[in-house]
């Protein structure tokens, strides 16, 4: 018979058999593979003829591996050959011929024996164990009975053990006992080799016999341990707040005692324990007072205590306080109500006195020249302390510190006051100026470009003369002459503004003029807000212009009184820009912005802080001929004249809030109006806050109405 040589493949070398307690039972010996070989049909338990096999089964032959590739360890080849031959005294001639073939094969097995696959493990001892398996398996293959009629007494001891194992397996299956599944180790997948079948520990023989007895007898109920654990890991680990159980009585214990599953060995011991338990229960019943039994179904309906409910309460039962969530107190609705009232109070208090820096874009817009003056009140020289306290924008600390250090350098005074020559009122440091008689002017320096072009030659001469002359008298005369020029210009502008306001008031309900009328009136081309702004209420919010265009003629006509300045060079432009950024207008009230947006403003802040003078030296209305050049008076310069949005829009382009005829606020205030300053200041603050809160209330009402109409009333 030719020798078919097959060496160990790479797969067999890399993926070794993982040794476990199942690997021994799944050993690939012939007795394990064919446990029914040599057994009679009654021993096999066959009661009917086998059905036809639909698929042809190819017999499996073990690969022949040469002995030179096998390492048998300490086992010598003589031990392999010396296994005893089975004797067959009554075999016919055909069987004798087969026996000769078997002896010839055993002679060849010295060089190339037919060996089944070894079971391998990762340990170093597995090779020696595999070698011993080879020896046993060779003995089994050499002694396999060829004919079923050969008696069991001629089989070897190894074969008889395998047959006994097969019988035991069949008997256990018939008896209904749990049998370890026998898999062919050669056909095991890699998954089956790595993940071994989990089986319970083998039971004791006495317990197995007891099981067989219960299975065979029909009258004795079979005892089977509950192999499936019905209690989940969650129930085992989580011992929540269990409901209060009713006390158990002795009668209940007697009725339910058969529910406990006890092994037969322990039942005899339980009888004595049961008697002791009953005696203890009787003693307990005597000592404990009887409780009124309440049925369990009336204690809690629909609320099962779970881990989630024990750990996570509903959000309504928590309160975030001092950085941690705590349980809610009983007066939670009252606290919410109180907090909402406080928030509403703060909101009303802030309206009209605070301006967000997010709206700086609106302050810097070119459209601010169209707002009119909102107040006609006097200077703040004698503002009382209670009014100053009501003005939230004031800075009392800076008022105290800055007033103590008046500057004595005339150059600084000259530079700073050149930028503020038109100021006719006195301001105390630390008090904002919402009620100052503000002269109309362009919002920022960018609007003054057209007038700069016209007046540059004259202004340069004035600058040179200002640097040379330091006389205060001549400065006062020139300053008053400038005031008279302003009065003449004011009247012409007021007439023009009257025409625009009269045309705008002609609309029935007040509010913005329609777009066709605005086009007829002409003027600056507005943004897309022409179509999107509401007819009544609301301000025009504009985006900053990327390129600063030269101011057209229309803007020159609509400029305010403050657009005339005696000196406008690059230095004063930077100064005015710095001061305007420092004092961000807050709905008419000036506040100090501690975070200037540009670097050039930071350089000039210190100069403005130093230049201060006592208020009493400044005349309110100096009278001088207009021909003199101004040497400016010394005024407190830290609080710059406001370049803020004053009041409501008067330009016909921006008719949003026009509902009543206004008095002409562009006239300079008379001297008699400066008597009762406190009342004017109080009324100004209250009127401004009331107007802003009214607008906010109207906007909120419109939003609520729109929401109700959209979603439907609830």
From Swiss-Prot:
Its main location: nucleus. One of its GO terms (molecular function) is microtubule binding. Coiled coil: none annotated. Residues 460-469 have a biased composition (Acidic residues). A motif (ST]-E-Y-X(3)-F motif 3) lies at residues 232-238. Residues 93-111, 482-501 have a biased composition (Basic and acidic residues). It comes from Homo sapiens. This is Nuclear protein MDM1. Residues 622-635 have a biased composition (Pro residues).
